[in-house]
Amino acid sequence: MKYTDNALNILTAKSYKGIGNAWIVKNLKGNESIETIVSLLNKTIKDEPTSEDEFERLKRNFESKLIEKFEECCDGFVALGDPYFPQHRGNVKESERPIFLYYKGKIDLLSIENVNITVIGLLNPVGDIEERERKIVEQFVKNGATIVSGLAFGCDSISHQQALDSSGYTVAILPSPLNNIMPARNKGLAFQIVEEGGLLVTEYGTDFKSSMELSSRYKERDRLQALFCDTIILAASYAQNSADLHPNLLGQKLDSGARLAMGYARDYNIPRAVMYDEYLDESNPMFDLNRKLIKEEKEITIITQDNICEKTKKILNKKPTVKTTATFQQGNLFE
């Protein structure tokens, strides 16, 4: 398993009470000495001051636990300041920037130099939604893009499977640790993604303790789907109020992950696109969110069955969104 001393330092610092992503981003660039980190922590934490010895003890404890827990299922972990830690796209506030990732597969697929297209949607697509989504994914892969999505059933799985069928690369972002792939029924797809040169990535090294925590993790996963892509594409999704708009859906709890991811993309100034054909989808509730986004944003790209090639080229030729740049000390990854 590959990791740097810097990654262990970031993980250890984050374990202190009151220390979150925003604090890490504001105070650490990566590769600081333990003396410096402890000094900064003691200016912030409200508990008893920590010490270099205590920090070192916590750090080695984390290291032994991670090796024991993930040696068989994780290729490594990277943190802010590491040479292979992926930079986010777009304008992301400090509290929402990732600082630490566990991975299995090729972490460089999230590189700022890579062209990444996120394709997402609902859990239960019907009719010709799958066929149309596959054609879009196929075209992007054909033009050299890497596909990014969650690992949920439905549109997420379709995007990964088509990327693999098209001999392309794909990245699955998880809400769970790598030793507990979720959903469990998609473990086979997860293994296939890695075997065929793709990537599994997660911010989590522990299992969730409650349904509320799991819900929060799905939201955090949705933000990563947005900030690690150059454009995000919505295949199909219900809107937040779909159950109220359609009598046959009254009382149903409809999935909202795609809605959240598209919202994060808007906030981060990541280009957005939707799959939508007015003549086919006008009365289909599974395209409620697509219609809503089209009404809200005049600049959104609309992909139909007839313009896939044209819109693919347009999306890939867009100027990149604002991307952060930083100079990292080239710490050595070690086994």
Residue ranges and their predicted role:
Residues 1-7, 80-335:
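Glycine-biased, small-residue-rich flexible motifs in mid-sequence functional cores and linkers
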Residues 1-82:
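Short, small/acidic-rich helices and loops at N termini and domain boundaries
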